[in-house]
């Protein structure tokens, strides 16, 4: 191994160059590895000898065998070509140009050759595809013709046209002659008689012999096996139902066998052909047989056809019920936070998966969705406090519920939901009306909203309650800062001044020409509270001249209330009566 990394790289480069150049060396002596060291020579002499040999070999080969090393990923063709051309002589340059020209012409020739070859192949393949398409269309047409011919070969046809009047007579006859079926079976709206076949035999699985003559009645969703309706004495006149299968729950298949038909039943003692039918239901197999193969094949084909239809209908109905159940769950349980206390919500949640609710929802789905969407818009309007649109939307929903003729549970649920949303809007409006600093214009607007919702009386109560708290708050502030005589005077002034302002605002807000009894009673309550406050302040004090002056001054504050035709003197007279008793 070389003593240092640079000598190692030199040897590695020389070995790579020599391995490439050695392919062009014809004789065996030159094919020996140039890196082998001769015995008896020093390492330095061998290295110089290898360099001279490498230079000689490179000079004899093509110019592309120049010892150029580059990174494949970052290779720059222009710079590489410049490096190659800068050391070339004129002859070498001409030789390189001729070689490149030959390569170019060869590539062009190959491209043209491949183009015409591929074009011919494309034209050939296109023709084959067009021919195959034509053959396929002919094959499809032939299949349709064969299907029509095959159906025409089947001479057994026991179907009934549902529009034919005779089908009603046939069903009525079967209804009166078959025992073991309730009235609900015949009154099913979607049930239709497909075919009826007689002279079938119920086969004993153990000995493969017939044991009973039966009839086969195929409906679009059921398969009935009844006792044969014979007029002999040995057989009853009425048909008894032996099997009543749901088509979606059975597996039906035909069996080809030959064997004894049963002399007791057929009154024959010879070998006859029986065409058997196997029906599997709940891991239990039932065998039936008939002499006519066409009857059996027709029964199998019709049963499988309607079985497939029933399975498709069941799958579609199952998907619809699942979708309806999820939609109902969204419409109802999304309101759990607001509607959990309502009885209609609780009852509807318990019956979400019942068939009655799902069928009712299927009929009234569009209306329920439309009403739910209106409620969603209403919730957005309430959250944005767009009360004009919200109140209009409430009226629209109310009108739709009255005319919609919804299912009882849906109607009760939406009615309670509407009541809940009205309550929400009313609470927000009452809360805003109770603000102490509400403006007159805003207050009038809120009162109009409450009037349209039918809660104007509640608004009046909230207004009076908020003003009661305002008067108490102001009187409390006076009590903390004034002595007793001044306190009485200040409180009386505040109370009567607030009552006068409140009266004026009350008349304007609620658009009244005169005060209603409820408001008059509220004013009297405030004056009585003032009198109680004064009496409580002088409970342990002497009613001297200061008291008399304060009480007399209070009478002057009553002027504004007198102008509003409110007589508070009977209540204020209590203050003078107390003073008179003290003087006595």
UniProtKB/Swiss-Prot annotation:
Where does this protein have compositionally biased stretches of type Polar residues?
19-35
* Any one GO CC term of the record: transport vesicle
Q: Which GO terms describe its biological process?
A: protein transport; vesicle tethering involved in exocytosis
Record keywords: Cytoplasmic vesicle, Exocytosis, Protein transport, Transport
Reply yes or no: does the keyword Isomerase apply: no
Q: What is its main location?
A: cytoplasm
Region annotation Disordered: where it falls in the sequence: 19-45
Report any Pfam family annotated for this entry.
Exo84_C
Its function, per the record, reads: Involved in the secretory pathway as part of the exocyst complex which tethers secretory vesicles to the sites of exocytosis. Plays a role in both the assembly of the exocyst and the polarization of this complex to specific sites of the plasma membrane for exocytosis. Also involved in assembly of the spliceosome.
**What interactions and quaternary structure are annotated?**
Component of the exocyst complex.
Q: Which family does it belong to?
A: Belongs to the EXO84 family.
Protein name, UniProt field: Exocyst complex component exo84
Which species is this UniProt entry from? Schizosaccharomyces pombe (strain 972 / ATCC 24843) (Fission yeast)
- Gene encoding the protein: exo84
């Amino acid at each position: 191994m070389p003593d240092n990394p640079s000598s190692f790289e030199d040897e590695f480069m020389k070995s790579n160059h020599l391995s490439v150049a050695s392919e062009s060396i014809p004789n065996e002596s030159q094919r020996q590895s140039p890196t082998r060291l001769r015995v008896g020579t020093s390492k330095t002499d061998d290295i110089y000898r290898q360099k001279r040999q490498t230079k000689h070999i490179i000079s004899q080969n093509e110019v592309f065998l120049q010892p150029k090393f580059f990174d494949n990923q970052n290779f720059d063709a222009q710079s590489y070509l410049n490096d190659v051309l800068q050391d070339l002589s004129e002859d070498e340059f001409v030789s390189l140009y001729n070689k490149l020209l030959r390569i170019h012409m060869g590539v062009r020739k190959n491209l043209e050759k491949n183009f015409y070859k591929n074009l011919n192949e494309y034209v050939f393949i296109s023709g084959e595809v067009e021919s195959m398409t034509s053959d396929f269309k002919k094959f499809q047409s032939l299949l349709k013709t064969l299907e029509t011919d095959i159906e025409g070969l089947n001479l057994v046809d026991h179907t009934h046209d549902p529009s034919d009047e005779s089908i009603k007579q046939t069903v009525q006859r079967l209804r009166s002659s078959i025992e073991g079926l309730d009235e609900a079976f015949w009154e099913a709206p979607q049930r239709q008689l497909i075919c009826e076949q007689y002279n079938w035999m119920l086969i004993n699985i153990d000995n493969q012999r017939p044991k009973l003559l039966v009839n086969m009645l195929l409906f679009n969703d059921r398969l009935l096996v009844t006792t044969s309706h014979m007029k002999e004495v040995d057989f009853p006149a009425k048909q008894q139902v032996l099997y009543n299968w749901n088509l979606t729950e059975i597996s039906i298949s035909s069996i080809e066998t030959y064997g004894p038909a049963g002399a007791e039943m057929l009154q024959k003692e010879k070998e006859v052909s029986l065409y058997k039918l196997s029906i599997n239901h709940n891991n239990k197999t039932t065998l039936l047989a008939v002499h006519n193969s066409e009857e059996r094949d027709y029964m199998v084909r019709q049963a499988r056809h309607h079985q497939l239809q029933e399975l498709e209908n069941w799958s579609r109905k199952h998907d619809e019920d699942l979708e309806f159940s999820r939609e109902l769950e969204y419409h109802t349980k999304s309101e759990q936070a607001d509607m959990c206390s309502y009885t209609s919500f609780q009852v509807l949640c318990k019956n979400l998966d019942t068939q009655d609710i799902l069928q009712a929802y299927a009929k009234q789905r569009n209306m329920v969705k439309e009403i739910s969407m209106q409620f969603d818009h209403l919730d957005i309007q309430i959250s944005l406090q767009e009360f004009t649109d919200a109140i209009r939307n409430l009226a629209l929903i109310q009108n739709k519920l009255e005319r919609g003729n919804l299912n009882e549970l849906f109607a009760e649920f939406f009615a309670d939901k509407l009541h809940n949303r009205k309550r929400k809007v009313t609470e927000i409006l009452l809360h805003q009306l109770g603000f102490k600093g509400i403006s007159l214009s805003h207050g009038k607007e809120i009162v109009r909203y409450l009037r349209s919702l039918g809660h104007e009386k509640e608004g009046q109560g909230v207004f009076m309650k908020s003003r009661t708290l305002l008067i108490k708050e102001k009187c409390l502030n006076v009590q903390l800062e004034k002595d007793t005589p001044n306190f009485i005077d200040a409180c009386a002034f505040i109370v009567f001044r607030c009552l006068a302002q409140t009266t004026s605002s009350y008349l304007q807000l609620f658009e009244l020409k005169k005060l209603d009894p409820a408001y008059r009673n509220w004013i009297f309550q405030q004056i009585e509270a003032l009198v109680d406050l004064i009496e409580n302040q002088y409970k342990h004090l002497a009613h001297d001249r200061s008291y008399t002056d304060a009480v007399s001054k209070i009478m002057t504050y009553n002027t504004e209330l007198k102008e509003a035709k409110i007589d508070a003197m009977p209540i204020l007279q209590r203050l003078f009566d107390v003073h008179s008793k003290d003087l006595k």
